[in-house]
UniProtKB/Swiss-Prot annotation:
Family: Belongs to the plant globin family.
Known role: Leghemoglobin that reversibly binds oxygen O(2) through a pentacoordinated heme iron. In root nodules, facilitates the diffusion of oxygen to the bacteroids while preventing the bacterial nitrogenase from being inactivated by buffering dioxygen, nitric oxide and carbon monoxide, and promoting the formation of reactive oxygen species (ROS, e.g. H(2)O(2)). This role is essential for symbiotic nitrogen fixation (SNF).
GO molecular function, one term: metal ion binding
PTM annotation (Nitrated tyrosine): residues: Y26, Y31, Y134
Binding site for heme b: S46, K65, H93, K96
Subunit structure: Monomer.
Protein species of origin: Vigna unguiculata (Cowpea)
Compartment(s) of residence: Cytoplasm, Cytosol; Nucleus
Tissues and organs where the protein is expressed, per its UniProt entry: Root nodules.
Taxonomic lineage from the root: Eukaryota, Viridiplantae, Streptophyta, Embryophyta, Tracheophyta
Pfam families to which the protein is assigned, alphabetical: Globin (PF00042)
Residues recorded with modification Phosphoserine: S46
Record's protein name: Leghemoglobin-1
GO annotation terms (biological process): nodulation
Modified how: Nitrated in effective nodules and particularly in hypoxic conditions; this mechanism may play a protective role in the symbiosis by buffering toxic peroxynitrite NO(2)(-). Nitration level decrease during nodule senescence. Phosphorylation at Ser-46 disrupts the molecular environment of its porphyrin ring oxygen binding pocket, thus leading to a reduced oxygen consumption and to the delivery of oxygen O(2) to symbiosomes.
Length: 145
């Protein structure tokens, strides 16, 4: 069980709303960061075959889904102290052989993107809340393998 406060959930929700304010822009930031840190990740995402394109609905849709899952993770943590991931999500990550290092790269890209999205509203408290929500989501996905 993880203690997650109402304030932490609100911080994560606010960051998600900032991301949603310009999904194409922040999707590009997110995937560009991933590819800078781990160029081989291009092979994990079929929609990156032609590079990072803000007009690609699969790119923006996947980013929105991931950021939404982190927001949902925060809600689950506040409500129950744990996160449960859909079995299909675990199966996809297992099939793609996503490893711990790749989860770390995604977390770093997520944090960088949200930091840019919220601008001067970024704080250590927000960063901690986002990282905790993501870490618990990643653990739940791995458990669902």
């Amino acid at each position: 069980m993880v203690a997650f406060s109402d304030k932490q959930e609100a911080l994560v929700n606010g960051a998600y709303e900032a991301f949603k304010a310009n999904i194409p822009k922040y999707s590009v930031v997110f995937y560009t960061t991933i590819l800078e840190k781990a160029p081989a990740a291009k092979n994990l995402f079929s929609f990156l075959a032609n590079g990072v394109d803000a007009t690609n609905p699969k790119l923006t849709g996947h980013a929105e889904k991931l950021f939404g899952l982190v927001r949902d993770s925060a809600a689950q943590l506040r409500a129950s102290g744990g996160v449960v991931a859909d079995a299909a999500l675990g199966a996809v990550h297992s099939q793609k052989a996503v490893n711990d290092a790749q989860f770390v790269v995604v977390k770093e890209a997520l944090v960088k993107t949200l930091k840019e999205a919220v601008g001067d509203k970024w704080s250590d408290e927000l960063g901690t809340a986002v990282e905790l929500a993501y870490d618990e989501l990643a653990a739940a996905i791995k458990k669902a393998y």
